[in-house]
UniProtKB/Swiss-Prot annotation:
Organism: Helianthus annuus (Common sunflower)
Domain of life per record: Eukaryota
Similarity field: Belongs to the PPP phosphatase family. PP-2A subfamily.
Protein name: Serine/threonine-protein phosphatase PP2A catalytic subunit
Lineage start: Eukaryota, Viridiplantae, Streptophyta, Embryophyta, Tracheophyta
Pfam families: Metallophos
Residue ranges the record marks as coiled coil: none
Amino acid sequence: MPSQSDLDRQIEHLMDCKPLPEEVRTLCDQARTILVEEWNVQPVKCPVTVCGDIHGQFHDLLELFRIGGSAPDTNYLFMGDYVDRGYYSVETVTLLVALKVRYRDRITILRGNHESRQITQVYGFFDECLRKYGNANVWKHFTDLFDYLPLTALIESQIFCLHGGLSPSLDTLDNIRALDRIQEVPHEGPMCDLLWSDPDDRCGWGISPRGAGYTFGQDIAAQFNHTNGLSLISRAHQLVMEGYNWSQENNVVTIFSAPNYCYRCGNMAAILEVGENMDQNFLQFDPAPRQVEPDVARRTPDYFL
């Protein structure tokens, strides 16, 4: 097992945007022993800073830490989608996992729909691992670890955080607590819905244009919040141009933390600071200065930007 000094050395190495050579397996093994003890609805205390999609935009993650404060000084909650699309998925996910192992009570990392074997084989993480390591071992270590990530989090029993959205199969938090999460993300069903669904202007449940999950209306979100004694659903999963977007009569907020998404969308990013008294403050930020782009052929399909 790596010591704290080993982890500090690894984190310092990763902060320079350098992949770890051979220590990834040990790091993932240690992270698994931590994550297996966490819940499907992981309780989180305030103050905490809530973050949306990162998608391999490593230098923008460093900018996020510059704006929001470094770990462990700031307590962080990340709502998934650490990999794919950006050029530095390996460095991004390795840094977040190393921070989790080093400061387990100061960072919560949830599962997004991209923390999946199938999706990462299409949208970049698998190919990046092959390019940077010469084989798929690191990809396998991380995708095996992804099965253990909590699905949702609950800040002070009031703010419900997850990657995607609600499910017609899940009326209560106890329904979510009863799921068996330690598996590849299924193509359908409640676990899939939590990672894939989106809020919609239309009431009720709808068919998702993504081909997985559902759309859910303001009536659904309001009922879920009322049933479970919640003040807010905080989620990520969708590009919003200002970095955050209130919807569904303020029952739902979307947070997106990858500025200039895919290096071309022109959006701002945001994070949400939840204070000691549950007060809410959004911090917006622009992309970090562009680095020299790696020589990568961009063949990944857009699916949903």
